[in-house]
Amino acid sequence: MQVSVEATQGLERRLTISVPAEQIEKLVKDSLQREAKRARIPGFRPGKVPVTVINKRYGAAIRQDITGEVMQRNFIEAIIAEKLNPAGAPTFVPGATDGEKFEFVATFEIYPEVELKGLDAIEVEQPKASVTDADVDSMIETLRKQHATFAAVEREAADGDKVKMNFVGSVDGVEFEGGKADDFELQLGSGRMIPGFEAGILGHKAGEEFVIDVTFPEEYHAENLKGKAAKFAITLTEVLAANLPEVNDEFAALFGISEGGLEALKTEIRKNMNRELEQALKANVKEQVINGLLANNDIELPKALIDGEVNVLRQQAMQRFGGQTANMPELPAELFTEQAARRVKIGLLLGEVIKTNELKAEDERVQALIASMASAYEDPSEVVAYYNSNKELMQNMRNVALEEQAVEALLKSAKVTEKEVAFEEFMNKATGRA
């Protein structure tokens, strides 16, 4: 086997590989003979079909298969010999056979050489927060509102009430599509409607008819309504006030607390809040570390890896439609290219961090991650056992643990400052409610 390597552009490499033609001819001959022994062709006894007949019928297909196998095998031997690390499958172009040698070209991309830079320039503001008694009480109040019952009242509508109404919206005196509804139910203070809509209902009673003036936000989804002034003619048909359940042992029973009553509920709430806080704190720091790593390290990315990640993201997006994708057009790659490139870059950089620091997934950390995740389920021990018995899930958890360890390694050289934050403020930002 003779090999020449050419760097064409960027990470692309072109291998020209020559192998003795007799190697292919021998393999083709052997394959034809094997086929002749097992072929069943009318007019010939089993095992007695002439090779010339087999060659006429199947020779082209057999030669094509053998050629593919020879190219694949010799390509692997060549990249091992040349110490090349392909980032994707090669494209093979077979050449002509001159009787003495068979030559083919393999084109592919290699992984970039990654040299980590600017690790000591990564800046991280590490938030410090804890769950207080007031936070637990606030969560209980939220749960009370979620379990509220509503009853009709004859007073003016107030924040927190539910209202039922009929309305018609218009712009410049003309009704617009989607601006009309009957028996529409809305909880005041929910923020479901455009600015000014809910505020315009406050202070009105059931049976009243009135008009409110609002302006659609510039970022509104309907192009024809962006920034437009509108009027809504409203008929308020019902005002319903919330009746909140009392906070007692019966309230605790609503959440499956059979023993310990209210105090047991508070303990469970605090445990869940602490778990969510810990996850959010980790995610916040990780995002800052990753962003700093990306900003300080520019590397060339193999197109093959980006294309592969685009396909993964596209499949995930299609699955979110509930599998109803048979008649849907394929989502364009451009929708996912930026996110795919980011994920590939993160993977390559963290891979180098793991390699440089000789990191291996710590078993204790893996089990701690599984236990933390399982604690959100009714029977944590069953979930832990399921994970430990599933190789694919365990590998996923090892990858998560290894990523955590890589982030911690980067934190050691980063510029870290701590900042005290309130639980509610931090969690609102973390969940996008700020």
Curated annotation (Swiss-Prot):
SUPFAM superfamilies: FKBP-like (SSF54534), Triger factor/SurA peptide-binding domain-like (SSF109998), Trigger factor ribosome-binding domain (SSF102735). Its EC number is 5.2.1.8. One of its GO terms (molecular function) is ribosome binding. It holds the Pfam family Trigger_N. Gene3D superfamilies: 3.10.50.40, Trigger factor ribosome-binding domain, Trigger factor, C-terminal domain. Its main location: cytoplasm. InterPro entries: PPIase_dom_sf (IPR046357), PPIase_FKBP_dom (IPR001179), Trig_fac (IPR005215), Trigger_fac_C (IPR008880), Trigger_fac_C_sf (IPR037041), Trigger_fac_ribosome-bd_bac (IPR008881), Trigger_fac_ribosome-bd_sf (IPR036611), Trigger_fact/SurA_dom_sf (IPR027304). Residues 160-245 form the PPIase FKBP-type domain. GO terms for cellular component: cytoplasm. It catalyses: [protein]-peptidylproline (omega=180) = [protein]-peptidylproline (omega=0). Keywords: Cell cycle, Cell division, Chaperone, Cytoplasm, Isomerase, Rotamase. It is found in: Cytoplasm. GO terms for biological process: 'de novo' cotranslational protein folding; cell division; chaperone-mediated protein folding; protein transport; protein unfolding. The keyword Metal-binding does not apply. It is an enzyme of class 5 (isomerase). Belongs to the FKBP-type PPIase family. Tig subfamily. Involved in protein export. Acts as a chaperone by maintaining the newly synthesized protein in an open conformation. Functions as a peptidyl-prolyl cis-trans isomerase. Consists of 3 domains; the N-terminus binds the ribosome, the middle domain has PPIase activity, while the C-terminus has intrinsic chaperone activity on its own. HAMAP family: Trigger_factor_Tig. This is Trigger factor. It comes from Shewanella sp. (strain MR-4). The gene is tig.
